[in-house]
Amino acid sequence: MERPPLDIVALRLCHCRAATAASEGALHIAVQLYRACLEAAERREDAQAIHFFAQKLSDCYEKMGLRDKASSFEALAKA
């Protein structure tokens, strides 16, 4: 897997692809893309983006029925 995008434009494009995948029911792809976004947000040290992408991951895992993973990302989103 390639490194998460650092520049804001690449991050936004990755987020848009993740949102599209989630809305189309391709949750495994959405999770992969949202994880890349979360890693980029962590590397940028952007707390607001970290919380946002952690919540998106929590939502995806909840829809997938993976409550334990959803809970861990929900905790990160609220930290």
Q: What residue ranges belong to the model's regions?
A:
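TPR/TPR-like (Sel1-like) alpha-helical repeat modules
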Residues: 55-79
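Residue register of alpha-helical TPR repeats
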Residues: 12-13, 52, 72
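Amphipathic alpha-helical segments of tetratricopeptide repeats
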Residues: 38-40, 78-79
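Structural signature of alpha-solenoid helical repeat scaffolds
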Residues: 5-6, 45
